[in-house]
Amino acid sequence: MSNIVVSNETKSQSVRTTKDGRQIRYNLQVIQQPERARACGSGAKSSADRRPVDPPPIVELRVFENDQEITFAYNANFFLHASLENARTIAPGRAPSTAGPSFPVLTGTPVAGMAYLDRPTPAGYFIFPDLSVRHEGKYRLSFALFENLAEVKDLDPEDPDVIYDGNHFVTHRCEVKSAPFTVFSAKKFPGLSESTALSRMVAEQGCRVRIRRDVRMRRRENKSSKEWDEYDEEGGGYDRARGTATPDNYGQAPNAPLGDRPRSLSSASNPALAPPRRPSIEEMGHGYSASNGYQQQMPPPQTPAYAQMPSYGSNQPQYSQQYQTPQPAPMMQPPQPPQHSTPYSQHSQHSSYSSQHQAQPPVPMNQQYGYSNYQQQPQQPQSQSQPQYDHAAPPRQEQMSSDYAHPSDYRRSSITQSPAQQYTASSHPVQPYHPMDQYGRSQQMSQPLHSSPQSYASSAPSHQSLPSLRPIVADKLEPVSPSYQSPPTSMSAAISVNSDGSNQHYALPKFNPQTQGLPPMSATSNKRSFSSTFDSRHLNERMVAGSRPQPSGAGYSYDPGSPDMEEPMDRAAMSYRRADGTQRQRHVPEVGS
């Protein structure tokens, strides 16, 4: 949109004839144009945070009589009034104008008197150091010259030949307009530049002009660090993104789509700006089960004990493929073995899965491998639920694998063999709760349980790769010592499981502090009372007749009633008082001179 062209921009002149026939010419010129301003608004704080137009406009006046300059000799008073005009055409209003309170757009001091200065050239100057604009836009200033005559000969021909006392009237003589300047909003305001040489020159001659000796411009170009103020101008698009449609779109149809609708600034529409979500328990469980499935796909080590069982190695990858798919609860669903597999191979798959579950380190956030196994598998014996400790799990695994190994295989030394027999015998009367356990129990009825050390060897890397987590104190149970020497049929009474699976009763040994080598703890606290160490008579007894606490009891080193001259100290004995109130004496050894 182009600016409105005016004829009297920057320069203007007017000529008039006096009563005696002389021609007076007035030449007005804007020698310092306004360039920028910051909109101060019309709120309550507009007057407090108001920025003047920069640089301050300066208008020069010269008065001529018949081509002879008489600026300093002309006897008259001049003042210049500034008004604000739009530099561009204003579109007609879209809404009917309401008669409401309207504030003047131009604020400050719009009137300036003439100052006779010698520099830059001898002339009269009008300076406007305090002009502000309320609203942003493109404006220009219009300066109107008014004259107050002091002599009758300078009056106009139609004026009466009288000069009123007190100068009651002025006459409009000339008008000049400034160049268009821009009023910015507070966020887009580029700042103030250093005061011009003309402003300094005027200020040196006594005029009140604000002088800035440093540049207060916002460095928006060639600046590496993008701050919030420059983010809008340097292509960051913060204001551009959250800005709504411009007023030009108000005239469109209600249902017409906006072509350049700004994108929402919400972090939900941009995944990169959204805060990261913490992984849930199920997601961590899937990743943990997938890593274990990868460990099971490794070929088992070649040991001479299981060299005669090729069916175990052939069914192991098949079992891993069944459990690699992510499921919410892999422990709750039994594997679906093929119908052509032998019972021994099916049982070996289940035993390897259960033995690997024993060797895995506890992960509290995982529901399959954490401490919640007591609710998920209430029918398992304590030896399977106990490997919640980092270093106690391998001996348990070795014991279980050695106790249930085939008699013809090589077996490692174990603590006792009775728990294995009791477990086998007591596994029949226990009622299963899970399909997984029911599947395992049906296999145990037909054949004895065979646990292979290969499953422990394959799960050992996962036990070392994952860091052990600190066990929860509330769910921590003491390891059960293998003291089950009762007949095989009494195992079901020692380890009882409720029908609802909510409460479990384990035969745990009672904690004895004497066997652990811990010092006995008394029921009461060992903290000494105040009166056993310090004199508390002044606290418990009455203080009458100006009495004060007397620290002259036994054990105190100072006695106010004793004479100033004390007895010589016995160097053979050293007496002191302990914190518990007891008096102690120690022999001081003689040091040879």
From Swiss-Prot:
Family: Belongs to the velvet family. VeA subfamily.
Composition-biased stretches (Low complexity): 310-326, 341-360, 367-389, 450-465
Subunit record text: Component of the heterotrimeric velvet complex composed of LAE1, VEL1 and VEL2; VEL1 acting as a bridging protein between LAE1 and VEL2.
Knockout mutant characteristics: Leads to hypersensitivity to oxidative stress, compromised reproductive development, repression of asexual sporulation, and reduction of virulence during maize infection.
Domain Velvet: start-end pairs: 21-212
Domain-related comment: The C-terminal PEST domain is a region rich in proline, glutamic acid, serine and threonine residues that is required for the light-dependent regulation of development and secondary metabolism.
Residue numbers spanned by region Disordered: 1-21, 218-569
Pro residues composition bias: residue spans: 327-340
This protein's UniProt keywords: Cytoplasm, Nucleus, Sporulation, Transcription, Transcription regulation
Record-linked Pfam families: Velvet (PF11754)
Described function: Component of the velvet transcription factor complex that controls sexual/asexual developmental ratio in response to light, promoting sexual development in the darkness while stimulating asexual sporulation under illumination. The velvet complex acts as a global regulator for secondary metabolite gene expression. Controls the expression of the T-toxin gene cluster. Promotes oxidative stress tolerance and acts as a virulence factors during infection. Negatively regulate mycelial pigmentation and controls sexual development, as well as asexual development during vegetative growth.
Motif Nuclear localization signal: chain residues: 35-40
Compartments it resides in: Nucleus; Cytoplasm
Gene: VEL1
Stretches the record annotates as PEST: 443-487
Extent of Polar residues compositional bias: 1-16, 413-429, 440-449, 482-505, 512-534
Name recorded for this polypeptide: Developmental and secondary metabolism regulator VEL1
GO biological process, one term: sporulation resulting in formation of a cellular spore
Cellular component, GO, one term: cytoplasm
